[in-house]
């Protein structure tokens, strides 16, 4: 369903659809209200499978065109700055309730400034801060604490089932042009396709020149052997 209307002095639109898969259907609803120089957007989704993945994302975007100085060319419009205020909402991942905390994202002069995006369940969390841009000196940092990497593979439905709780930092710079990425993670109870590999310390780097990832992993199975894996992957 798609609906557009113009009640009063605002523009209102709604979009609803379902994505059916063999594992069940995913229902998605998007609603936006625009008025003056701002847009309020809400995204709701939910599935119909045995394990629940659902939630709500809400944000208010303000568009600002800053005044130019008198000596500048008045024919050229100043750049548009967008300030997005992320609203507090909840998300259910694998039957577990997570909180999305208030944060702010600013788009200005070709850069994206992420200010304390915070996603948590009790002591577990994902926090993002930094600048996304083509410039190599601009870096964005992700901090993970006991984040189940299985969520990513469950949602993506890649046919590969990795499990484990990841803790540690990840960095990315020059993301929009020549990205340089690295991570140092401790993954507790790393598993693959229902098999337990053990606790893992993983260092990874994205090599833009070869379009591949270099991985150095130390995996220790409890009370047994230590496995060391070091190789580039493409």
Model-derived regions, located:
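Interface amphipathic segments
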Residues: 1-230, 234
């Amino acid at each position: 369903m798609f609906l557009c209307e113009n009640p009063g002095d605002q523009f209102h639109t709604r979009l609803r659809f379902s994505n059916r898969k063999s594992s069940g259907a995913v229902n998605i609803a998007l609603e936006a209200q625009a008025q003056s120089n701002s847009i309020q957007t809400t995204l709701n989704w939910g599935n119909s499978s045995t394990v629940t993945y659902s939630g709500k994302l809400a944000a208010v975007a303000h568009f600002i065109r800053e005044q130019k100085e008198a000596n500048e060319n008045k024919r050229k419009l100043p750049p548009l700055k967008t300030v997005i205020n992320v609203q507090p909402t909840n998300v259910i991942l694998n039957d577990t309730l997570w909180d999305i905390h208030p944060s702010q994202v600013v788009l200005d002069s070709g850069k994206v400034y992420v200010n304390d995006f915070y996603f948590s369940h009790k002591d577990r969390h994902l926090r993002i801060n930094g600048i996304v841009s083509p410039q190599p000196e601009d870096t964005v940092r992700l901090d993970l604490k006991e984040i189940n990497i299985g969520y990513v593979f469950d949602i993506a439905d890649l046919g590969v089932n990795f499990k484990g709780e990841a803790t540690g930092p990840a960095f990315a710079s020059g993301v929009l042009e020549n990205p340089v990425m690295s991570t140092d993670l401790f993954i507790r109870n790393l598993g693959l396709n229902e098999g337990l590999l053990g606790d893992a310390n993983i260092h990874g780097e994205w090599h833009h020149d070869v379009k591949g990832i270099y991985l150095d992993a130390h995996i220790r199975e409890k009370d047994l052997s230590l496995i060391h894996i070091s190789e580039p992957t493409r």
